[in-house]
């Protein structure tokens, strides 16, 4: 008799949880909710404490504090109970003596700083002594001869910040902390991807990303409601598709956006994930800003002798806001290819934050050379629909100076997993094939079926007994015909109706099957050798079961006949409404209750990763390019700007704002955690996978596409995301 299967130790766990409670095994599978995930991380940290000879049960540890931070907004009862339990422990238990919190995957916890080596403190003391002496000299000089002092009063103040910062690590979790001045606030520049194999085929993927970000002062300190009305285009007949008319709110803030696959993964990582994983889901996101440096620019002399002088400004500030409650309009920067970019070794800039403002639009629909008056107007602001948001009134703003840092804390995603395999089974491939009566006598011969009049099967054709592969009814409709190149008009003007991305079939019907057209710059994959133009490509979805070959679609009359004449069939050669270039497939929609179709695939590197759910009672089933739609709030938009750096000429009543020319740099670092499942092997034949070919082969996958030239020029073109096939039915 076989021994009984061993079960993981459960300990005391409330109903609906796997890790929230004492005495659990660390191998209970996937956590049930964010509070349970925090409990799992807490248990893993306790396990590391115990292995290092410490007793975390009798002392309050950093792991306890992190659990408190992660469950502060918990909605479930277990998370709330655990949160207040450890807050009570913090009030009464002594603090665990530890230099650093143990990790569970061999990497430091995001938002924490490793303790500086001893020589740092020696250098700090020397620097403090030097700065104090310099400040005293400057004060003496100022009192004796009235010479202007630069940063003199700030020197001792900066040294005091150094001493405070040296006492312990910087703060984290949704706020800024004193970094201690120039040369003290340090961090790690990490763009690695870690794979932690959890058992049962599950993999935890942790992608780190770091960028150096350059930030200029805003063009204006004001919010501006600006209007675009390109009447030179739209005032001409037939130019409706050139319409750019709109109003937007321009803000003095910038958006730090990492919502693109290329920000997080290098091409070889994406190759590994796509070739080996069957599905993937988002888990958590952490972000931090550190090593803030703010400089002022002054110009000496004039004319040909003019030179610019750059100085560190230790009193200027950078403002940081995190819209964690999604109050502000949601504006993914990848829509315009304005993320942090795909090259970790290249400095980048944030995207100017702006959003649409309500404005009615009226534009005549015309054709080329049509005579008559064209209506081309824009309305005024509506009291009913106007929404003007300011960051200063809706967000808590942190002020960072040179050397300071900021951490967002951990955001946990609530999304559905997506598949990383494609399916080839169309309607014609569902179910049981027809029966073969005679097998081929040679490798080049065809098989023989039962005569049509003697076949059994199911059809939905009345008055005819033909059972063929074309007339048989399958259990569902895979994919569907959808109207394409359809422009509808709302209050804001005409817009192209989005089409579900599907494969393009043999007919290369890109428009009919929703192929996506990307236009992008050098930070997002364009050849760095290009001059004053953009790179473009068309993304055709790898979903071989969902596309339609519209040129070969047809509709037959009733009653059905197997040999229709011209009056009994509608084909793509029959024009619609007398328009010789428009056919019924342009407007035909076959979507219905029996329709099944795949989710849009992730698009590497230019595609969006996650999106916000529309706040409407009836939600779309999917979004055009983002495979993950957050069920609750999406990750908060991270906004930055330089605070006004004014001169002594400032006049609040003047339209001219006298500012010191200021710019800054900082390092952004993110940690994106995903959960994936390894793809099991099933077929006898080898499967297709992403693989590079030799240089100079003129092949799409030629390795030279991802290699730099002698002068550093490089490109980053899209890779397949669903190379391996699977069964649907």
UniProtKB/Swiss-Prot annotation:
GO terms for MF: metal ion binding; structural molecule activity
Cellular component annotations (GO), alphabetically ordered: host cell; host cell nucleus; T=1 icosahedral viral capsid
Predominant place of localization: virion
Biased composition (Gly residues): 168-184
BP terms from Gene Ontology: clathrin-dependent endocytosis of virus by host cell; microtubule-dependent intracellular transport of viral material towards nucleus; symbiont entry into host cell via permeabilization of host membrane; viral penetration into host nucleus; virion attachment to host cell
Polar residues bias (residue ranges): 24-35, 97-108, 134-157
Residues bound to Mg(2+): 325
Residues covered by region (Disordered): 1-37, 95-185
Sequence motif Nuclear localization signal, location on chain: 4-13
Record flagged with keyword Metal-binding: yes
UniProt xrefs under Pfam families: Parvo_coat (PF00740), Phospholip_A2_4 (PF08398)
Comp. bias (Basic residues): 1-10
InterPro entries assigned: Capsid/spike_ssDNA_virus, Parvovirus_coat, Phospholipase_A2-like, VP1/VP2
Keywords: Capsid protein, Clathrin-mediated endocytosis of virus by host, Cytoplasmic inwards viral transport, Host nucleus, Host-virus interaction, Magnesium, Metal-binding, Microtubular inwards viral transport, T=1 icosahedral capsid protein, Viral attachment to host cell, Viral penetration into host cytoplasm, Viral penetration into host nucleus, Viral penetration via permeabilization of host membrane, Virion, Virus endocytosis by host, Virus entry into host cell
Region annotation Phospholipase A2-like: where it falls in the sequence: 19-64
Subcellular location: Virion; Host nucleus
Family, similarity comment: Belongs to the parvoviridae capsid protein family.
Domain remarks in the Swiss-Prot or TrEMBL record: The N-terminus of VP1 is sequestered within the mature capsid. It contains a phospholipase A2-like region and putative nuclear localization signals.
Stated role: Capsid protein self-assembles to form an icosahedral capsid with a T=1 symmetry, about 22 nm in diameter, and consisting of 60 copies of two size variants of the capsid proteins, VP1 and VP2, which differ by the presence of an N-terminal extension in the minor protein VP1. The capsid encapsulates the genomic ssDNA. Capsid proteins are responsible for the attachment to host cell receptors. This attachment induces virion internalization predominantly through clathrin-dependent endocytosis.
Protein name: Capsid protein VP1
Native species: Parvovirus LuIII
Organism taxonomic ancestry: Viruses, Monodnaviria, Shotokuvirae, Cossaviricota, Quintoviricetes
